[in-house]
UniProtKB/Swiss-Prot annotation:
<keyword id="KW-0717">Septation</keyword>
<feature type="binding site">
    <location>
        <begin position="144"/>
        <end position="147"/>
    </location>
    <ligand>
        <name>GTP</name>
    </ligand>
</feature>
<dbReference type="InterPro" id="IPR019987">
    <property type="entry name" value="GTP-bd_ribosome_bio_YsxC"/>
</dbReference>
<dbReference type="GO" id="GO:0000917">
    <property type="term" value="P:division septum assembly"/>
</dbReference>
<feature type="binding site">
    <location>
        <begin position="77"/>
        <end position="80"/>
    </location>
    <ligand>
        <name>GTP</name>
    </ligand>
</feature>
<keyword id="KW-0131">Cell cycle</keyword>
<feature type="binding site">
    <location>
        <position position="61"/>
    </location>
    <ligand>
        <name>Mg(2+)</name>
    </ligand>
</feature>
<dbReference type="InterPro" id="IPR030393">
    <property type="entry name" value="G_ENGB_dom"/>
</dbReference>
<dbReference type="Pfam" id="PF01926">
    <property type="entry name" value="MMR_HSR1"/>
</dbReference>
<feature type="binding site">
    <location>
        <begin position="59"/>
        <end position="63"/>
    </location>
    <ligand>
        <name>GTP</name>
    </ligand>
</feature>
<dbReference type="GO" id="GO:0005829">
    <property type="term" value="C:cytosol"/>
</dbReference>
<comment type="similarity">
    <text>Belongs to the TRAFAC class TrmE-Era-EngA-EngB-Septin-like GTPase superfamily. EngB GTPase family.</text>
</comment>
<feature type="binding site">
    <location>
        <begin position="32"/>
        <end position="39"/>
    </location>
    <ligand>
        <name>GTP</name>
    </ligand>
</feature>
<comment type="function">
    <text>Necessary for normal cell division and for the maintenance of normal septation.</text>
</comment>
<feature type="domain" description="EngB-type G">
    <location>
        <begin position="24"/>
        <end position="196"/>
    </location>
</feature>
<dbReference type="GO" id="GO:0005525">
    <property type="term" value="F:GTP binding"/>
</dbReference>
<dbReference type="InterPro" id="IPR006073">
    <property type="entry name" value="GTP-bd"/>
</dbReference>
Length: 196
């Protein structure tokens, strides 16, 4: 699968179902804790530097951001979870917004859950993965920041994350570095069956 980086646009930032775009395109949602690198991942996958706004400040994405990717699919950037400085009320609001999207959106075909390869999955990572499995949502786990781990230890870290998430044998886990940028095609190939 190839995408034209010049044919990508943010369609809408939504907080409720009525605002979701009316489209026939399949959707791939990206979830992960705050600062795991969701926006950086989106930018590196589509070959654009600043399409999805990155921030040093965790918890910056507060809406569901729908990106039309070359009229082939829609990436949905979901607010990051597990950010302590967001108020309890705000966390509950995010929770409801994400739940409504995940449980009601028929266009949703796949969730890419991003976890930090350097660390054990957080309790929130585990809860999110279990939540997706509870609703039978196909999930691709991408371990970000691969470049921060010595090459010889990458597989050990992947195995650890797979074990701690208690991953479904049908789900795939891949390590990724937005800096090395060498696995986009592999990931597009994993996404493609869900959107055709």
């Amino acid at each position: 699968m190839k995408v034209n980086p010049n044919n990508i646009e943010l369609i809408i930032s939504a907080v409720k179902e009525e605002q979701y775009p009316e489209t026939e395109l399949s959707e791939v949602a990206l979830s992960g804790r705050s600062n795991v690198g969701k926006s950086t991942f989106i930018n590196s996958m589509i070959g654009r530097k600043n399409m999805a706004r990155t921030s040093q400040q965790p918890g910056k994405t507060q809406t569901l951001n729908f990106y039309n990717i070359d009229e082939q699919l829609i990436f949905v950037d979901v607010p990051g979870y597990g950010y302590a400085k967001v108020s309890k009320t705000q966390r509950e609001k995010f929770g409801k917004m994400i739940e409504e999207y995940i449980t009601k959106r028929e266009n949703l075909q796949l969730v890419i859950q991003l976890v930090d390869l350097r660390h054990d999955p957080t309790q929130d990572d585990i809860l999110m993965y279990n939540y997706l499995k509870h609703f039978d949502i196909p999930t691709l786990v991408i371990c970000t920041k691969e470049d921060k781990i010595p090459k010889g230890k990458v597989q050990k870290h992947i195995k650890n994350i797979k074990t701690q998430l208690d991953m479904d044998p049908d789900d795939t886990i891949v390590s990724y570095s937005s800096i090395q940028n060498n696995k986009q095609q592999q990931i597009w190939n994993l996404i493609e069956p869900y959107i055709s």
